């Protein structure tokens, strides 16, 4: 079954796919970052019965505009956010492999994961401000 056929049988049937290179499809869906940019989500067959959802490094690139992962603690927070959703970080790309019949739920879970990762800098500001008052 192709990725397009799998999407047709889910609530995501209104989503569109654009093939970016052979076997790699960009998901065109109404899923947006806080600034209005569309979340970059790519779908690839991982096996006959599973699909890889990934971002090809776009989430960490967005995060790097405002926030540096320059300490072991920040790296651990990032890794914890990703692993708590059952995903992995592969060469800068956040990846989640889901069974074909769980694609829609996987896309929704993945979009929440990307939102959490991209909002790490907000977490950092809140931690700094709360520590500021603790040290007064």
Model features per residue range: what roles?
Residues 1-108:
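Nuclease-adjacent, charged terminal/linker segments that flank catalytic cores
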């Amino acid at each position: 079954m192709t990725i397009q056929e799998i999407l047709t049988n889910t609530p995501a049937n209104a989503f569109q796919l654009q093939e970016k290179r052979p076997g790699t499809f960009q998901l065109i869906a109404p899923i947006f970052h806080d600034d209005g940019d569309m979340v970059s989500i790519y779908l690839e067959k991982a096996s006959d019965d599973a699909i890889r959802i990934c971002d090809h490094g776009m989430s960490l690139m967005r995060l790097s505009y405002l926030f540096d992962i320059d300490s072991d603690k920040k790296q651990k927070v990032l890794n914890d956010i990703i692993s708590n959703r059952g995903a992995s970080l592969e060469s800068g790309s956040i990846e989640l492999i889901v069974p074909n019949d769980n694609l829609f739920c996987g896309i929704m879970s993945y979009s929440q994961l990307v939102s959490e990762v991209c909002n790490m800098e907000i977490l950092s500001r809140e931690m700094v401000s709360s520590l500021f008052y603790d040290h007064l």
